[in-house]
Amino acid sequence: MGAKPRVGLFVTCLVDLFRPSVGFAAIKLIEESGCTVDVPMAQTCCGQPAYNSGDRADTRALAESTIEAFEGYDYVVAPSGSCAGMLKKHYPGLFKGEPVWEARAKAFSDKVHELVSFLVDVRGVARVAARHAGTFTYHDSCSGLRELGIQAQPRALLASMEGLKLVEMQEADVCCGFGGTFCVKYPDISNAIVEKKTGNIDASGAETLLAGDLGCLMNMAGKLKRQGSRVEARHVAEVLAGMTDQPPIGGERSR
């Protein structure tokens, strides 16, 4: 029997700082798919905020350190379509005209996968053992859907869970208004977008909102809370792993 594939988990800034439980859920799911998981301590930001702001020098520096930190692994997995999209789609272009670094970036990007896509498309996971009663709706993040083609995969795994009912909101594939630094630079536009999104979430009748990107979830959860909605928000990894003992995103920890 061959050695298990080695996965380097790219935790992401938001998961590290605001929702570590997503990282632990990701580790559980990856291990259950038959892999070993490490969390390289040298990792930092993927560089997307700098990249979207036009700061190629800092983005490149972050890319170099990330590539070096993960080169020894068979796969690089991130519980975020946004960060995975940055690592997979944009790193090679930072090194155009530099054959050595461009080749390293290409080899790195070929190993990068978003978490749920990795489970379904790479490891062939068709169902999970976790159970969870309730009604859920799913938001497709812009980067996950448009850069990586992630849409059917999370729904397939959620459909395999006993007790879980998935209902589709209207325009599930439309932006939530977060967009990283977009929500800071254009707050009025961002607010109008998320207001429409939360209206669709409430109208779905779901008790819980799921998504694969913590930035989107924090944005939508904040708006739902300000509107007085009873809908809770969770990262899809937590539900798939059966690790829902933490308060919902934006919720208060019990004392």
Residue ranges of model-derived segments:
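Iron-sulfur cluster-binding electron-transfer modules in prokaryotic oxidoreductases
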Residues: M1-R255
